[in-house]
Amino acid sequence: RDSSTSRGLGDVYKRQFIGGSILATFTQGMTVGAVINGFSVTGRAYSGGPFDWLTVFNLFCGAGLVVAYALLGSTWLVMKSENALQQRMRRVSRTLLILLLVFIAAISLWTPLAQPAIAARWFTLPNLFFLLPVPALVVILSLCQWRCLKNPESHHLPFILTLGLIFLGFSGLGISIWPHIIPPSITLWQAAAPTQSQGFMLVGALLIIPVILVYTFWSYYVFRGKVQHGEGYH
């Protein structure tokens, strides 16, 4: 097989990998939007239509999550790369940060306007005082992120701050719908599996989770540090 054929197959694989990653992330974001909107449930069974998920809000949430994960990827490359690639990723990350803040602001305003229960959760007293740190931290982390991306000596903080922004975003989701797991009517406890099933799963989790953690820490240790030019899989 000649090198041109190998390069062609490599390009096809890259496009498929990119497309599949974007589609999976977009679908996950649409799922988040559908959870915020709530589901039609009658007698503990879904009673909505087959295309209830296809709304402008859900599509918007899907696009927002694509931007969030793209920022995770670009700041990861800031941390792992150097020279020209790192500088390019810093510029890309600044653009993605602005886009992410636009999506966060739009969804944060859109959600309470469309869902009175969520508006009451966030904007009534004394809840407002207790929940105000969430948007305040988003602003603080974003300002720190911008400064770090402009600082050529900052390598790890942009990625860590992006993790913080995404954590705050999902924390806001949890605050908005708690204690419901299937809004607007089924709570976490109502949707829970029987106690015996949970106990069985707990035993398996206690055995598997330590193995996963050890493997994850070891893989990060092996691939620690910067990736030099020419290194990687071919």
Predicted regions and their residues:
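Transmembrane helix-loop-helix
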Residues: 1, 95-98, 102-164
